[in-house]
Amino acid sequence: MERPQSSIWVFMLLLFMVLLQSPAWHVAAQRCPQTCVCDNSRRHVTCRHQNLTEVPNTIPELTQRLDLQGNILKVLPAAAFQDLPHLTHLDLRNCQVEMVAEGAFRGLGRLLLLNLASNRLSTLPQEALDGLGSLRRLELEGNMLEELRPGTFGALGSLTTLNLAHNALVYLPAMAFQGLLRTRWLQLSHNALSVLAPEALAGLPALRRLSLHHNELQALPGAALSQARSLARLELGHNPLTYTGEEDGLALPGLRELALDHGSLQALGPRAFAHCPRLHTLDLRGNQLTTLPPLQVPGQLRRLRLQGNPLWCACHARPLLEWLVRARVRSDGACRGPRRLRGEALDTLRPSDLRCPGDAAAGDGDGDEDEDRPAGPRAPPLRSPHGEAAWATPCPPACACVAETRHSTCDGRGLQAVPRGFPNDTQLLDLRRNHFPSVPRAAFPGLRHLVSLHLQHCGVAELEPGALAGLDRLLYLYLSHNQLSGLSAAALEGAPNLGYLYLEHNRFLRIPGTALRALPTLVSLHLQDNAVDRLAPGDLAGARALRCLYLSGNHITQVSPGALGPARELEKLHLDRNRLREVPTGALEGLPALKELQLSGNPLRALPDGAFQPVGRSLQQLFLNSSDLEQISPRAFSGLGKGLRSLYLHKNQLQSLPAPLGLSGLELVDLSGNPFHCDCQLLPLHRWLTGLNLRVGATCATPPSVRGQKVKVAAPVFEACPGWTARKAKRTPTSRGSARRTPSLSRH
């Protein structure tokens, strides 16, 4: 009776030993990190909130889903997940990640979802996302990204959703999303975007939904948006837009839904959406619209959302109501006034219900059509050039003044003189696209609260002395695209707290140095695309607080030593697209805070030794692209150390380049578009590149046998060079001390 029972125990023991040797059991029992939970049946591993500082190296190889939320990884090194080739989902939320090294995700060719939300990323280096050819969804929400470099997403050809919401983006460069051929939804909400380059959205042929709500767009970027030809849904709510019209150039043939809700819209051009033939739903809730013109859109518009606007249901709204009925468009707005119609739904009214004082239809004598408006006492309706009514008191004729936002606008009204009579508490005054050849003395009386003044495209040729009198709080002055050739200190005396002065696209031949003496707090001066030919001592004598100086696109041939000296706080200097034949090294003396130097597009041809020595300790970004560079001295970058983050040398004529040793902090180097001659003279550069964990784009143009090969990997060309064997020997312990060690610029 005992033998069968003994046989059973022997069988179970043998079975246990077999299972113990199986790969699955071995993985489950031996490879699960102690701080993690491994579910081998579903191939899930969870290591949440374990204070991990690096990715555990004993995670089962067959894992498909890895959850590392809430750890302290900070840096993701190259090949951090190379032992997990089967991963499809990777969650790295709230891991305090500050840097992703290039190649961090290489080997994850099956990954579908990468979640990097709620970390501390301020930049993404090129090649950081290499190896993710199957990725469908990338979450970068809630980081600290300030810029996007073209090419960052170039390896993500399968991506369908990209989430960049809740970052710190202020600008989208051209081709920012190049390579995203299948992306259908791009989320950019809750940033600080104010400018989109015209080609920013080029290269997104499949994009169907774009979220740009909660940004700082003051004008509709129609040219940029129209690049996304397949867009069906566009979300632009919660931006400080005050007006949009056909001139903004929005042309989206497939657009079905457009959200412009909760902005500052005061007027809308009748043909603003004339080039969106399939538009079905237009959301204008929560703006400052008192009425709308009949919109000239093709017949597919079916819903117009107007809730939360101060609609004034008087005779001026009849064309709108008649159009809504005729076009069979449903609307949900309600009347703010007059009193007898307050709270009435717009779509329940008849045209005869909308009347003004003196109308024959006003037979009941109630006399309330001209009663109190939201902005104050009674005033007649104000008309914009497109026929919209705009109610505010006081306010000059043909302008619109909104009490809630303290904004007043006369944009594009055809005015020949600066109007008067704006509300005394106005903070933003928009007078763009009128015709004021001269701005007279005391042109803005009573506007002591004014913060931002827009005078672009007004044909201004002169600001008379005292023109800005009384504008003690003015911070932003926009005078771009005018006819100015000079400015006097007397003209600016009334705005002593001005911080930002925009003078681009005028006729200046010199920096208006005398005028700057009246602006002791000026921090940013824009003089792009003028005709300035030189910078001389004294030009910036009054600009001691200046931090940003933009002189791109002028005719500058000389920057004299001492010309920039008074601006010791200067952080950004843009001298690109000028006629400089040499780096103005002497002029860089005395700029201890300079971080960004833009010299691209000048005919420099050569860089001598110590060209940037004066700003070596502070400089972080150096732009030398498209500068006809043919020769760079071996010590051209001497003085520049680990503080330099970006070096742009692309699109030059360099056949050779000395290795810029000592630049250990580089995060971006661009050497593309140079005709490098790959011979022994280039060996130092080859060595430097092999120790540099960055994508630089340097390729061989000659000899023909290696044309098109990357300098970094073209080792066969250099194997016969003197010194090549010494490099190989350097790797062995016996020769380590005798061979000179090449510094590595790897970021990890």
Curated annotation (Swiss-Prot):
UniProt-listed GO biological process terms: negative regulation of chondrocyte differentiation; negative regulation of collagen fibril organization
Glycosylation sites: 51, 625
Any Pfam family the entry gives: LRRCT
UniProt tissue specificity: Expressed in cartilage, including articular knee cartilage, where it localizes to the extracellular space in the area immediately surrounding the chondrocytes, not detected in any other tissues (at protein level).
Chief place where the protein resides: secreted
Annotated LRRNT domain residues: 30-61, 394-428
Superkingdom per UniProt: Eukaryota
SUPFAM superfamilies, per the entry: L domain-like (SSF52058)
Family annotation (InterPro entries): Cys-rich_flank_reg_C (IPR000483), Leu-rich_rpt (IPR001611), Leu-rich_rpt_typical-subtyp (IPR003591), LRR_dom_sf (IPR032675), LRR_TM_domain-containing (IPR050541), LRRNT (IPR000372)
LRR repeats: 85-107, 108-131, 132-155, 156-179, 181-203, 204-227, 229-252, 253-275, 276-299, 423-446, 448-470, 471-494, 496-518, 519-542, 544-566, 567-590, 591-614, 616-639, 641-665
Annotated compartments: Secreted, Extracellular space, Extracellular matrix
Keywords: Disulfide bond, Extracellular matrix, Glycoprotein, Leucine-rich repeat, Repeat, Secreted, Signal
Polar residues bias: start-end ranges: 734-748
Domain (LRRCT) ranges: 309-357, 674-722
Entry function: Potential negative modulator of chondrocyte differentiation. Inhibits collagen fibrillogenesis in vitro. May influence chondrocyte's differentiation by acting on its cellular collagenous microenvironment.
Annotated family: Belongs to the small leucine-rich proteoglycan (SLRP) family. SLRP class IV subfamily.
Record-given protein name: Chondroadherin-like protein
Species for this entry: Mus musculus (Mouse)
